[in-house]
Amino acid sequence: MKIGLVIADNMEFEPVVEKCKLYGGESYYICGDRAVSFETICGNKIVAILCGTGKVNAAGATAALICKERPDCILNIGLSGAIKGVYKNDIVIGEKFLEHDFDLTPLGYEVGVKPQPKYIFEPDEELFNRFTSKFSKIKPCVFVTGDMFVSSTEKKEFIINKWGGGCCDMESAAVASVCYKMEMPFLSLRKLSDDADESAAGTYRESNNLKEDVLINMIISLFG
């Protein structure tokens, strides 16, 4: 099985690079984005791309990774901010993915609504069940995505009131959208770095600088 990983930040990517070195993998580039690949002990292959922050970067890198490597699934991993019902240091898994900053309200649409049949996405059911069955402490929640770092109580309350979102990030819904269009099984797994409030910037930096390998360890543990 070939597992594709889409990762936004250098610090989030570094633990995967270290695993690549440990397993004797290779480093290269896909459409200008840094990528690494390695085989696990059980013969599964992990291919990871460093997409950069934000929805456009994530969407472009996801499409490039799928076209170049033809993985069996795509996993988006990294850090997120806690919105509701989840807390800093929790590991969360997306049960729905949507964009909180898409705004056509002058044209009569509600915030977040797109004039297309599908704009809220779900994870692949088999992948979701595999992760939640093996790791009982994972918390399922709604992932809301936008091209902004959420760091205010006002914005946080807006997201809660509008969607009841569990956590916020800057990539997952974009990756989900590309995977939906390309008929690629998708899942996002995140560790919560901050509370998406006025203290978020500082606590995010602290968490990011740790370069923790908990998420890639879970993936290797599951796929062997």
Walk through the language-model features, giving the residues of each.
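A C-terminal functional module that forms or caps the active site or interfaces directly
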Residues: 149-201
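Alpha-helix C-terminal capping segments
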Residues: 64-68, 84-86, 177-185
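Active-site-proximal beta-strand elements of phosphoester/diester hydrolases
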Residues: 46-52, 142-144, 189
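N-terminal short beta-loop-beta anion/metal-coordinating cradle
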Residues: 1-63
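Mid-sequence, gly/pro-rich, charge-dense loop/helix-turn segments that line enzyme active sites
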Residues: 80-163
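Proline-aspartate-enriched helix->loop->beta-strand connector
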Residues: 70-75
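His/Asp/Glu-rich mid-to-C-terminal helical/loop segments that flank catalytic regions of hydrolases
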Residues: 196-224
